[in-house]
Swiss-Prot record:
<keyword id="KW-0479">Metal-binding</keyword>
<keyword id="KW-0735">Signal-anchor</keyword>
<dbReference type="GO" id="GO:0005829">
    <property type="term" value="C:cytosol"/>
</dbReference>
<dbReference type="GO" id="GO:0070062">
    <property type="term" value="C:extracellular exosome"/>
</dbReference>
<keyword id="KW-0325">Glycoprotein</keyword>
<feature type="disulfide bond">
    <location>
        <begin position="77"/>
        <end position="119"/>
    </location>
</feature>
<dbReference type="GO" id="GO:0008378">
    <property type="term" value="F:galactosyltransferase activity"/>
</dbReference>
<dbReference type="GO" id="GO:0000139">
    <property type="term" value="C:Golgi membrane"/>
</dbReference>
<feature type="binding site">
    <location>
        <begin position="291"/>
        <end position="293"/>
    </location>
    <ligand>
        <name>UDP-alpha-D-galactose</name>
    </ligand>
</feature>
<feature type="binding site">
    <location>
        <position position="291"/>
    </location>
    <ligand>
        <name>Mn(2+)</name>
    </ligand>
</feature>
<keyword id="KW-0464">Manganese</keyword>
<feature type="binding site">
    <location>
        <begin position="196"/>
        <end position="197"/>
    </location>
    <ligand>
        <name>UDP-alpha-D-galactose</name>
    </ligand>
</feature>
<feature type="topological domain" description="Lumenal">
    <location>
        <begin position="32"/>
        <end position="393"/>
    </location>
</feature>
<dbReference type="GO" id="GO:0006682">
    <property type="term" value="P:galactosylceramide biosynthetic process"/>
</dbReference>
<comment type="function">
    <text>Responsible for the synthesis of complex-type N-linked oligosaccharides in many glycoproteins as well as the carbohydrate moieties of glycolipids.</text>
</comment>
<feature type="binding site">
    <location>
        <position position="226"/>
    </location>
    <ligand>
        <name>UDP-alpha-D-galactose</name>
    </ligand>
</feature>
<keyword id="KW-0472">Membrane</keyword>
Length: 393
């Protein structure tokens, strides 16, 4: 019986194929290489045990702070900046003061804008950070992110989107607000949606978009043991072009509280006919600032009901249904502050009455920023064909 089985052509082909697979496995270096073939590429090797200071190499940047604008006709910046250092140190203590952050970033212009002086940047990237009552986290992010991005030789601007009031936090809706307001300023090439408590650990993780589809950038967080928690995870830090953002109708507006919106967004990407790309695990390293659970950002009890409806609701819930009241647009020395009233959860309890800003929260922080603000210089209005993204609020 065994002999007849071995004489069958399909059995012989199976045996030959198995032998070839084993030979390939051994020639490529065993399990690690095989996993790189059939899993996700681990990418180049970096030594994270000897990180560089995040302010390394900034002295090599051309151009003096406050000098004349760069002349026209500059060559394009290199595709990969020669100023990159790889792994950088991330420290959560002490929390730097605003004065220290401003002093260490003299090339940053009002509104948190930067443009390299010696070459024409290949990408104009808007960093959009949803925020409420996380001042220490915000200072750590600003201290860390400005030099990180300057070494990449990008033109960039940082937008911090404050949710006014005491209602339930809505991260995804704040990101929609940030995208719309950022595109009123400039025709950005790339939109980086960035949680305030995540600090990048490797400047080879370029803050640029992929024209082929949305990028999920925070692929290896210390919170998850520097690995992706599950294949469709799209949380933390992501990057989309304005066209990609509009194609998926932006982010959902109905997720009040913690959880669910990341999975909804990943589903939108698929339903819009796009695919998620990621940097190698060895590059997309992030450290999360430790914090307790936020009051007003409790677990969303409706998230699973909303996820079930995503396939039918994504074309109606997003940028085309976004409503909010813009309360403030302020140019600080380190970022553009956008304060918006985005309403309250229609399914939850009514928000308690009180000041628009939680006690001890962003109001004092913002006032300190404004006291240090240089004279405001309004940016040019975009003439890009993103009318739907820049529509009225």
């Amino acid at each position: 019986m065994l002999r007849r089985l071995l004489e069958r052509p399909c059995t012989l082909a199976l045996l030959v194929g198995s032998q070839l697979a084993v030979m390939m496995y051994l020639s490529l270096g065993g399990f690690r290489s095989l996993s790189a073939l059939f899993g996700r590429d681990q990418g180049p090797t970096f030594d994270y045990s000897h990180p560089r200071d995040v302010y390394s190499n900034l002295s090599h940047l051309p151009g003096a702070p406050g000098g004349p604008p760069a002349p026209q006709g500059l060559p394009y910046c290199p595709e990969r900046s020669p100023l990159l250092v790889g792994p950088v140190s991330v420290s959560f203590s002490p929390v730097p003061s605003l004065a220290e952050i401003v002093e260490r970033n003299p090339r940053v212009e009002p509104g948190g804008r930067y443009r390299p002086a010696g070459c024409e940047p290949r990408s104009r990237t808007a960093i959009i950070v949803p925020h409420r009552a996380r001042e220490h986290h915000l200072r750590l992010l600003l201290y860390h992110l400005h030099p990180f991005l300057q070494r990449q030789q990008l033109a960039y601007g940082i937008y911090v989107i404050h949710q006014a009031g005491n209602g339930t936090f809505n991260r995804a809706k704040l990101l929609n607000v940030g995208v719309r307001e950022a595109l009123r300023d400039e025709e950005w090439d790339c939109l980086f949606l960035h949680d305030v408590d995540l600090l990048p650990e490797n400047d080879h993780n370029l803050y640029v978009c992929d024209p082929r589809g949305p990028r999920h950038v925070a692929v290896a967080m210390n919170k998850f043991g520097y690995s992706l928690p599950y294949p469709q995870y799209f949380g933390g830090v992501s990057a989309l072009t304005p066209d990609q953002y509009l194609k998926m109708n932006g982010f959902p507006n109905e997720y009040w509280g913690w959880g669910g919106e990341d999975d909804d967004i990943a589903t939108r990407v698929r339903l819009a006919g796009m695919k998620i790309s990621r940097p190698p695990t060895s590059v997309g390293h992030y450290k999360m600032v430790k914090h307790r659970g936020d009051k007003g950002n409790e677990e969303n009890p409706h998230r699973f009901d909303l996820l079930v409806r995503t396939q039918n609701s994504w074309t109606q819930d997003g940028m085309n249904s976004l409503t909010y009241q813009l309360l403030a647009r302020e140019l600080g020395p380190l970022y553009t502050n956008i304060t918006a009233d985005i309403g309250t959860d229609p399914r939850g309890p009514r928000a308690p009455s009180g000041p628009r800003y939680p006690p001890g929260s962003s109001q004092a922080f913002r006032q300190e920023m404004l006291q240090r603000r240089p004279p405001a210089r309004p940016g040019p209005l975009s003439t890009a064909n993103h009318t739907a993204l820049r529509g009225s609020h």
